[in-house]
């Protein structure tokens, strides 16, 4: 079965990898193709679309055709006894095309409603290629606004925003009921997103005030999780006890509480390797290149996001 993912433009590397990691964990990927913001996935398995952060829409593909063949496709595509409309992305004159294709459906007995459709026929135009199908999922962007860091009871500056936090949790491939660790949890951005997806979150921080505040934030969102006082360099966890790790490293060159960052990275790398299950992933955010510290891991992805003039985040996906 083919699905087309219309990806967020925020970061295509993250968007593509997020889809592929989850698809591999929930089912079987037969094939996939990238074309700018489009990802065509031949997939069989459980649907995971509600988890996605960096995908705007998912459409179940009916046909792939040229622009000149669109009317023929819409003369054959199934119609249903429910309100429907046609929505087009890409190409020129999309409003006129939506009306023309909607009229073809109406002539075939479809109930057309632009304002309140129950079924949406999607057409994505890329050059002369058209992807035609039925909309399966559309991301509600309000959820991220409602969960932004400044709306939490416990606040800290520079907290990771919910959209990126959810994407990085997804990059680890952790499923419902499995355990995700954030060993430098701060206000709990990763833990919140993990908990809302049915994942068991464990957070650790070395400052007692932050541990208490993070617990308050989890309780605010109705999330059951463990937040412990501890040191990321010496994790109070058993070997191979977590399925994934997502964390945001401190950005200063050194910190009084944690020692030098070189020490922090070298020791946390050892601890990540110890507590991660074999094949488990760690999604980490940092402001320095860390390949030398994680030489025992496979680097599946490295990308960058500019935060402001003096800060560019590096985002790594590491596999044990």
Curated annotation (Swiss-Prot):
* Keyword Cytoplasm in annotation: yes
GO MF terms here are: tRNA (guanine(10)-N2)-dimethyltransferase activity; tRNA (guanine(10)-N2)-methyltransferase activity; tRNA binding
Class of enzymatic activity (EC top level)? transferase
Q: What InterPro entries has UniProt attached to this entry?
A: RlmKL-like_Mtase (IPR000241), RlmKL-like_Mtase_CS (IPR053943), SAM-dependent_MTases_sf (IPR029063), THUMP_dom (IPR004114), TrmG10 (IPR005885)
Pfam families recorded: UPF0020
UniProt KW keywords: Cytoplasm, Methyltransferase, RNA-binding, S-adenosyl-L-methionine, Transferase, tRNA processing, tRNA-binding
Enumerate the subcellular locations listed in this protein's record, separating them with semicolons: Cytoplasm
Catalyzed reaction equations: guanosine(10) in tRNA + 2 S-adenosyl-L-methionine = N(2)-dimethylguanosine(10) in tRNA + 2 S-adenosyl-L-homocysteine + 2 H(+)
Q: Which GO terms describe its cellular component?
A: cytoplasm
Q: Name one GO biological process term.
A: tRNA methylation
Give the main localization category: cytoplasm
Stated EC number for the protein is 2.1.1.213
Asked whether the UniProt record includes RNA-binding among its keywords, one would answer: yes
**What are the residue boundaries of the THUMP domain, all occurrences included?**
46-136
Primary role: Catalyzes the adenosylmethionine-dependent methylation of the exocyclic amino group (N(2)) of guanosine at position 10 of various tRNAs. Acts via a two-step process that leads to the formation of either N(2)-monomethyl (m(2)G) or N(2)-dimethylguanosine (m(2)(2)G).
Instruction: State the similarity comment.
Output: Belongs to the methyltransferase superfamily. Trm-G10 family.
Listed under subunit, the entry gives: Monomer.
Q: What is this protein called?
A: tRNA (guanine(10)-N2)-dimethyltransferase
């Amino acid at each position: 079965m083919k699905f087309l993912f219309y990806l967020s433009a925020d970061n295509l590397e993250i968007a593509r990898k997020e889809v592929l990691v989850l698809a591999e964990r929930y089912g079987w990927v037969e094939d996939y193709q990238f074309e700018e913001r489009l990802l065509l996935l031949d997939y069989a398995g459980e649907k995971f679309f509600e988890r996605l952060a960096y995908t705007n829409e998912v459409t179940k593909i009916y046909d792939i055709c040229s622009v000149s063949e669109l009317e023929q496709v819409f003369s054959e595509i199934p119609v249903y006894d429910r309100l429907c409309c046609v929505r087009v992305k890409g190409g020129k004159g999309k409003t006129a095309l939506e009306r023309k294709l909607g009229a073809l459906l109406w002539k075939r007995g479809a109930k057309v409603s632009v304002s309140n459709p129950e079924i949406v026929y999607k057409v994505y135009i890329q050059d002369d290629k058209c992807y035609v199908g039925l909309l399966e999922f559309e991301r509600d962007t309000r959820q991220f606004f409602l969960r932004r860091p400044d709306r939490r009871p416990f606040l800290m500056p520079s907290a990771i925003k919910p959209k990126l936090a959810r994407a990085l949790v997804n990059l680890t491939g952790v499923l419902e009921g499995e355990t995700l660790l954030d060993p430098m949890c701060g206000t709990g951005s990763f833990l919140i997103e993990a908990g809302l997806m049915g994942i068991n979150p464990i957070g650790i921080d070395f400052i007692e005030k932050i541990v208490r505040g993070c617990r308050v934030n989890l309780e605010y969102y109705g999330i059951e999780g463990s937040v412990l006082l501890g040191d990321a360099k010496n994790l109070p966890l058993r070997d191979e006890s977590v399925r994934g790790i997502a964390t945001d490293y401190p950005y200063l060159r050194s910190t009084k509480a944690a020692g030098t960052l070189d020490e922090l990275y070298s020791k946390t790398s050892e601890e990540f390797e110890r507590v991660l299950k074999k094949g488990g992933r760690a999604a980490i955010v940092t402001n320095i290149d860390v390949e030398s510290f994680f030489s025992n891991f496979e680097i599946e992805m490295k990308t960058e996001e500019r935060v402001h003039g003096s800060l560019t985040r590096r985002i790594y996906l590491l596999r044990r």
